[in-house]
Amino acid sequence: MLLLADMDVVNQLVAGGQFRVVKEPLGFVKVLQWVFAIFAFATCGSYSGELQLSVDCANKTKSDLNIEVEFEYPFRLHEVYFEAPTCQGDPKKIFLVGNYSSSAEFFVTVAVFAFLYSMGALATYIFLQNKYRENNKGPMLDFLATAVFAFMWLVSSSAWAKGLSDVKMATDPENIIKGMHVCHQPGNTCKELRDPVTSGLNTSVVFGFLNLVLWVGNLWFVFKETGWAAPFLRAPPGAPEKQPAPGDAYGQAGYGQGPGGYGPQDSYGPQGGYQPDYGQPASSGGGGYGPQGDYGQQGYGPQGAPTSFSNQM
């Protein structure tokens, strides 16, 4: 019954959660950050390596042909030692050189906190979306935290890359042999048998810089949620209004409607010039070619001039 109740609670949370945010860049990048942070601290924090060398003395009874030296995270190599024959008496403790714990632990610490923050931010995106966007405080805090983690990834990855290079130098059997006094005595022979495998540590550095890329890239997506980019995002200019043509495109004062237009209604209308009337007979008071026609009243002759040529004659 308790298991069923827990399942109901989980189902309610899933039903109320906005899992679509995982498909968006903001949530999807957080998933990648969460996964890559796991790989970063796992490949570094769980490392353990081993190197092997041999010391062949002139006195064969004093030789040691299989010397194993183990070391691990956090790489306090100055505390790692092995017993090497002196070819003359009792074996002697020889310590490795260097303490590279600071860069390694710093890298792992940043990775762990980035993992925790990514998990918490992702849960906030899914189940507390309204609280996240309330008063725009959530996106602003998220942006600041993302910027801090991006900077921390840059510093920690660079420091750990340098630290790893020093670890490789300090655990190289050839360099260890160079520091052993017994190997420089005549008749003694020292050989390296196996180098430590550091491919896992190389992978941790790669994941460190991949996390840097993810966190820097995520700054843009979080920045858009803050609303700070709104003043810089100008709306595209609207389409310019169409200017009316002269005379309203043959509408108001153009073809066929205005008092000075060129339409068929005014060109040959009653206010025009020569207007013969073929339908009525010529008379003294009508139209046509008579004395009171268009030449007299509305024709080309001015008002007050003789209305017919016969009167002038």
Swiss-Prot record:
Keywords: Calcium, Cytoplasmic vesicle, Glycoprotein, Membrane, Phosphoprotein, Repeat, Synapse, Synaptosome, Transmembrane, Transmembrane helix, Ubl conjugation. The keyword Ubl conjugation applies. Pfam families: MARVEL. Residues 50-106, 162-199 are vesicular. Characteristic of a type of small (30-80 nm) neurosecretory vesicles, including presynaptic vesicles, but also vesicles of various neuroendocrine cells of both neuronal and epithelial phenotype. It is a multi-pass membrane protein. It is found in: Cytoplasmic vesicle, Secretory vesicle, Synaptic vesicle membrane; Synapse, Synaptosome. Residues 253-263, 284-302 have a biased composition (Gly residues). Residues 238-313 are annotated as: Disordered. The chain crosses the membrane at residues 26-49, 107-130, 138-161, 200-223. Residues 264-283 have a biased composition (Low complexity). Residues 254-304 are annotated as: Repeats, Gly/Tyr-rich. One of its GO terms (biological process) is endocytosis. One of its GO terms (cellular component) is clathrin-coated vesicle. The calcium-binding activity is thought to be localized in the cytoplasmic tail of the protein. Possibly involved in structural functions as organizing other membrane components or in targeting the vesicles to the plasma membrane. Involved in the regulation of short-term and long-term synaptic plasticity. PANTHER family: SYNAPTOPHYSIN (PTHR10306:SF10). This is Synaptophysin. It comes from Bos taurus (Bovine). The lineage of its organism: Eukaryota, Metazoa, Chordata, Craniata, Vertebrata.
